[in-house]
Amino acid sequence: MDPYKVIIRPVVTEKAVAMIENENKLTFIVDRRATKQDIKRAVEAMFDVKVEKVNTLITMRGEKKAYVKLKPEYSASEIAARIGLF
């Protein structure tokens, strides 16, 4: 899948911001058909980082949410600032 079609939007909630600061994780709403590998490739291509792991879930609204943990040498805070979350 095209990286720009996989990631729909970032999630900006208290929990998501806490995860950026404490756990080096970014949270996105993604295409429901995207696999964890698709999400990993999309984040790595769009933000020029390395991804350690991806956790996904389907929300009550029927959207797919992805928690993307970055490798320790990359900062989720810097990426969040670059995409305008802070």
UniProtKB/Swiss-Prot annotation:
GO terms for molecular function: rRNA binding; structural constituent of ribosome. Keywords: Ribonucleoprotein, Ribosomal protein, RNA-binding, rRNA-binding. GO terms for biological process: translation. Pfam families: Ribosomal_L23. GO terms for cellular component: ribonucleoprotein complex; ribosome. It comes from the Archaea. NCBIfam families: PRK14548.1, uL23_arch. Belongs to the universal ribosomal protein uL23 family. This is Large ribosomal subunit protein uL23. It comes from Thermococcus onnurineus (strain NA1).
